[in-house]
């Protein structure tokens, strides 16, 4: 072990700037009347999303004969929606979340998330509020908005909602995806979006991409105007995905169906099956108000604010140095 390994990966000046930005985030929401909340980091329920890998730990209690597996939070979404169901009104949270994925310049397995929910906001109104926050923190230009379909046609040259599987495979091969013919439609779309769209947008101003394909709805409602798309959006700026938001699904039966479909896909992929969060579904059944919500990566926001290229430069200690 190096004698210098004890030192922080962020400079003290950066940590001072980080604290100032986090204080400004709290001020932004306080001025708008949102309640700051705290929810558990540990839960007996993991997440079914096939794209997320969850850390686990064991609860060892003298009052229990068996150890209990608990999962570290990948997002405070489920407990925050339980608060909404209980009548909290508009809420926000700044918290640590954990995703068992590789570390790199843009990723850390432990990172800080800002998540907030707005009862009776539609997707477009929440997009505007994310834009307001970015201008407030970054002093940047107003965001540009475009649909997923438009962005795909502009930068990939095909319509993602109507293109055939063969056309998607052909395009993916142009971008050097090996064994493209083995991949499903969503994997091909996500690959093409990552390599051909993300690299071209948000260079000079933030960009909001909305109406992702319905097959990528996650916890978003399906659009009532076009059932091929979901009321889901993402923000991109300076080469980083900053935020992911939804007009939230509030139908407990549909949400249960999506969880079950996730677990079926997990089984096909050889991934662990996760127990469905019945407390969350009970809250949906009891009645979560129509709302929109969004999660934003705070460390990435700070990277942009300070002009830094590596996430380890904005956190006190990297995972390798923790």
From Swiss-Prot:
Binding of substrate, residues: 75-77, 117, 248
Domain of life of the native organism: Bacteria
GO MF annotations in UniProt: acid-ammonia (or amide) ligase activity; ATP binding; lysine-tRNA ligase activity; tRNA binding
Keywords: ATP-binding, Ligase, Nucleotide-binding
GO biological process: lysyl-tRNA aminoacylation
Cellular compartments per GO CC: cytosol
HAMAP family: EF_P_modif_A
Described function: With EpmB is involved in the beta-lysylation step of the post-translational modification of translation elongation factor P (EF-P). Catalyzes the ATP-dependent activation of (R)-beta-lysine produced by EpmB, forming a lysyl-adenylate, from which the beta-lysyl moiety is then transferred to the epsilon-amino group of a conserved specific lysine residue in EF-P.
Subunit structure: Homodimer.
InterPro entries from the UniProt entry: Aa-tRNA-synt_II, aa-tRNA-synth_II, aa-tRNA-synth_II/BPL/LPL, EpmA, Lys-tRNA-synth_II_C
Catalysis performed (reactions): D-beta-lysine + L-lysyl-[protein] + ATP = N(6)-((3R)-3,6-diaminohexanoyl)-L-lysyl-[protein] + AMP + diphosphate + H(+)
Pfam families linked to this entry: tRNA-synt_2
Similarity annotation: Belongs to the class-II aminoacyl-tRNA synthetase family. EpmA subfamily.
Species this protein is from: Avibacterium paragallinarum
Protein name per the record: Elongation factor P--(R)-beta-lysine ligase
UniProt EC number: 6.3.2.-
Residues involved in ATP binding: 99-101, 241-242, 297
């Amino acid at each position: 072990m190096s004698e210098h390994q004890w030192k922080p990966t962020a400079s003290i000046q950066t940590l001072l700037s980080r604290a100032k930005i986090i204080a400004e985030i709290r001020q932004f929401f306080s001025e708008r009347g949102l309640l700051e909340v705290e929810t558990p980091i540990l839960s007996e329920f993991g997440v079914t999303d096939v794209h997320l890998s969850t850390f686990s730990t064991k609860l060892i209690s003298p009052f229990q004969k068996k150890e209990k597996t608990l999962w570290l939070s990948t997002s405070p979404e489920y407990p925050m929606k339980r608060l909404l169901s209980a009548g909290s009104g508009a809420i926000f949270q700044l918290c640590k979340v954990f995703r068992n994925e590789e570390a790199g310049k843009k990723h850390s397995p432990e990172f800080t998330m800002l998540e907030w929910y707005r009862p009776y906001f539609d997707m477009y109104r929440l997009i505007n509020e994310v834009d307001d926050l970015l201008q407030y923190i970054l002093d940047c230009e107003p965001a540009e908005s475009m649909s997923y379909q438009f962005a795909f046609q502009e930068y990939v040259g095909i319509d993602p909602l109507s293109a055939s599987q063969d056309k998607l495979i052909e395009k993916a091969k142009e971008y050097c995806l090996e064994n493209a013919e083995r991949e499903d439609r969503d994997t091909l779309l996500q690959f093409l979006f990552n390599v051909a769209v993300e690299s071209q947008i948000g260079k000079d101003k933030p960009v909001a991409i909305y109406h992702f394909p319905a097959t990528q709805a996650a916890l978003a409602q399906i659009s009532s105007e076009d059932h091929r798309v979901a009321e889901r959006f993402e923000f991109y700026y300076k080469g980083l995905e900053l935020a992911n938001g939804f007009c939230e699904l509030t139908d407990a039966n549909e949400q249960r169906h999506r969880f079950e479909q996730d677990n079926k896909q997990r089984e096909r992929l050889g991934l662990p099956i996760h127990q469905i969060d019945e407390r969350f579904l009970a809250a949906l059944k009891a009645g979560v108000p129509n709302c929109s919500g969004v999660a934003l990566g705070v460390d990435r926001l700070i990277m942009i604010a300070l002009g830094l290229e590596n996430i380890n430069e904005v956190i006190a200690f990297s995972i390798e140095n923790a």
